[in-house]
Structure formats: C-alpha cells, structure tokens
Amino acid sequence: MDSGGLREVKEIEIAQLHLRYAHTRIEWPQKVLALANSIERFGQILPVIVLRDGANSFVLIDGYLRVKALKRCLRDTVMAEIWEGKEEEALVEILARANSRKWDLLEEAALLRELHDQYHLSQSRIASMVGRKQSWVSGRLALYSALSEDLLESIRKGAISTWAATRVIAPIARAIPEHAKTLSENLSKEPLSTRELILLFHHYQKANRKQREKIVSAPFLFLKALHAREEATEAKAL
C-alpha cells in the first residue's frame, strides 16, 4: 500500500460503511459517550480511516468508536480518510502506527489473528511488516487463542476488562475451565475493580476446590464477607 502520497479526505454516508472488523474492537461505552459529547460541542475532529471497496462503499479500517459516537449524535455522515489498496495492507499499516494509535492488547491480538488466519500471512511475515519481533506476534496470537469465544465477547462488550481476562480468568481457565466460565459470567453482571480482582485471585489460589467454587460463584459476596471479617478483626485488636 502506497502511504507516501496525500490521501483524499471527504464526508461520506455512514450507510456506505462496511463494519467488517467490528469484531476486533472493544466497544468501550464510556469512551463512546465522551466522544459523542465532544462531537456535539466541537464536531468530528479526526477522520476515520476507510478502504475503498467499490464505487460507493468503504470498509471501515479504524474509527469504530467515532462511528458509534456519530450514530449516537444522530449523524448520517462521517469525515473519512480514504485509502486505496488491499485490506491486509491497511490492517498492517494501522498496527504499525504504534506512536499514533494506542491499541488494547486484545484488539491488537484480534487484528493479528485476522492477518494470520484470514489472509494467511506467516507470523514472521506479520512481524516484519509491523516492525515487531516474531515473539511479539506469537505471544498475542497465543493469548487470543487461550480465551473462549464467550469471554472474548464479554471483553468486546466492555463487560470484562482485558486485564481481568488475561491476568485472572485465563490462568483459572487453564486449570479449571468451568470456574473461569462461572467467574466471567458473574463479572459481566457485577464488575470488580482491578484491586478487588487481585485480592480475589490471591484468595482463589490459596483455596481448596470447594472454597474456589464459592469464590467464583459469588465473587462480590466473597469480598464483602472478607472485608467484614477484616473489620471485625481490627475492631477486636483495639
């Protein structure tokens, strides 16, 4: 893909967009709300990136949150930077823009999976194209493969953070998959802070099988009871 020349930027209809890579993005409801508020006040500041796909249609490459925010503002059009070329080359280019775009770990992994599985690029080829080591590519692909589709969907919906998925749920899944499934379902309904998850995982690792089942079945209640015990112990010490 030739990125040396100037690319056309123009307003296009949102209805002309193919959201082909929506499954590789996290929805981030709070970020969408903040973007919508910004658009209402200042308009769309940065164009999204699209790839021409025929005379009147475009594949959305980057800018999924902006499109969601524009829809929330009841806008019908989006300012877009129009690229020409192959989709895999466009995906490689946005991944290579490490300094201008901060990716979530799972979003990166999902795009690498597209390049590897859908476009049949080898890990070494991908690494060379995005300017990374092969171990960087293989590590992210392995991480993505280790997560169940249900868990990935929870991450995409913003119900579970990438940190919780990779640092807590994935290690549990490697040992006892049903515990990971139960915990992820409960965290989707009642999220915990990073600090609470660290504490929960610490106690889970030390617990026996029966205690672990109780922890994953009711994580919020477990932490509430733990906090109550700690307060009672402190009160006795006074």
Which positions does each model-derived feature cover?
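Amphipathic alpha-helical extensions and coiled-coil-like segments
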Residues: 109-118, 139-238
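Generic structural "secondary-structure junction" signal
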Residues: 19, 28, 62-63, 96-100, ...
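Amphipathic, charge-rich alpha-helical segments that serve as recognition/docking helices
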Residues: 24-26, 33, 68-152, 157, ...
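Short, charged/polar connector segments at secondary-structure boundaries
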Residues: 1-83
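Exposed, low-complexity/repetitive linear segments and helix-based recognition motifs
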Residues: 8-10, 90, 105, 228-231
